[in-house]
Amino acid sequence: MSARIELNLEADVRPPGEDCRALVARIAASPEFQRASRLRAFLAYVVDRKLADCPDEITEVLIGHRVFGLPIDYNPGDNSIVRTQARTLRDRLERYFRGEGAHEPVILEIPRGGYVPVFHLREPVSQHMPVPVSHHGTATVRERPPTRRHWLYLGASAAGLSGIALMRALRTAPTANIAATYSPARVELESSDANLTQAFSQAKQRAMQCVYGGDPIGQWYASDPISRVFCMRDVAHESFGAAVLGLEHHTENMLRRFAASAAASRKWCGFWTITKDGFPSPDTYRDNTDFGYCLPANFDLVRACYQQLRWTGNRAYLDAVFSGFYDHSVTSYVDAWDRERTGWMKANAAFRRVHASYNQRPPQFATSADLVGAQYAAYLAYAGIQDLKGEPGSLSRRMAAEYRAKAAALRSRFDSDWWNAAENRFYSGILPDGSLSSEYVDQSNVYALWFGLPAAGPKIEASLDQMERNRPHYDSTYSYFPEVFARYGRNDRAYQGILEIAGQSSNYPRGETAFAALGAIASGLMGVDPDVPNRIIETLPRLTGEVAWVRLSRLPVGPNEIAVEHHGTTATSFTNQNGPPVQWRPVFQSNGKRFAHAVMTIRGGETKRATLA
């Protein structure tokens, strides 16, 4: 009889190989599979169908049709390609787990006589999860971990498990998701301004053309309607607009894949692009020494995950896969790319396709303003995540305070060391020879503002003026403009930017501008700022003279659908259209000062109003 291994479902245990798809990605990246695209597709398909609890789709005929492109009515007796490829796949899996994957505690195999993959443990898992080590070399412990699905009983034959229980154990989606299950794209906008209404409609239509399902990767969206890959930077940026459309499950799926892909063998970089089949794109990944990446991406992803947690309340973003990624991104990742311990992360010439900036054109920086900005934003996001994990006085709360202090120190140093007084703007980056580059690089400077790096004051205003004078080379960079201008009070410029990028979305091949327009309308123009874990939603009207009133309705926020209606910048109404009671904090701005009302409780179906006194 096969040995059975039982794990405590409620204990804070992270068995190795918890994310099956991460295991498949490592297998696909190994020398045994790198140049075997059909075997990778075969493996991705059968694992995906198993995780989707669809074993009836793992048949010879369907594999032949969906993986190898054979007609749906082909006769397996006349074509043995599936059986032949299955034998090769089994052999290569066996070689992987004997060789490069000899360290893998979880083994994946496809038993002879069928095509349904099975997972089992090479050896019993310890009941105590290894404690993560901080960059100071001291152990850290997370308080109050969220409940997760764990591997239940895994053995050579998964004996003792029902099929349903096994599938639940293998799924990566956690149980603690409190987000609503409303259909995507129910959100609507009405306004006195026909241009704004049209812009919203165009952006919504274009964005939904970039949304996919039914691929081995699961639910996902891309930066253009014909893409078959998704990119880490694009997803981090598009996730704000995707939240407006109710695509929280698509977003979590993609962010999880990126988080799981970060590895010590690549100095904690993840995969820059992932295909619809769940593998790193060969254009950006050849092996662990030759891959394309931009160093701000890890930090951008940490920030995006935290924003999704605040918007959706989905505590999956606190599980082991994500938490491990956050921990490594603010510790091991920083150390790996700051070898000289100067406090600035730097690109390493040994990794020729790893860039310090999202800007990949000359000049090539060793360190960039957008990298520093992303690191600053990630430290603040990490602090917010730690706040959600611990009680007052706990280690998590102390870590939150530590990383807020780190963020403040980074901002202060940037403010003093990177200011170009001669040109009244910040430098864009540090060159490989250690000098500050005098060239203005739009991506570096715009993203630094996007991440909120510069402190408020005259330098911010000068930086915004510089943005106004320097139209970016890339429309994708320009798509960041509206929200940046809205955040810093230039509402007229934000409004014009929204109309421009939404108009681009109707004829521009990339859908990124569409997602950006939706995000800028909701969080910029409407000022919707949810904090679902704490049951508070804040609003701040940033309308212009062209817009007398605007109403955004059926907006999914956590388990609720809400409607927010602004009349100018002095009156707001809030409706809880669906869901449990929420707390609303109306905020207004006048003459550069913020005025916040007392928090109101809004029950389901109820509407309340607030005005600037």
Language-model features: where?
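Active-site core of glycosidic bond-cleaving carbohydrate-active enzymes
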Residues: 199-201, 228-264, 320, 324-331, ...
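The feature captures the catalytic groove of carbohydrate-active enzymes
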Residues: 217-228, 270-300, 315, 331-404, ...
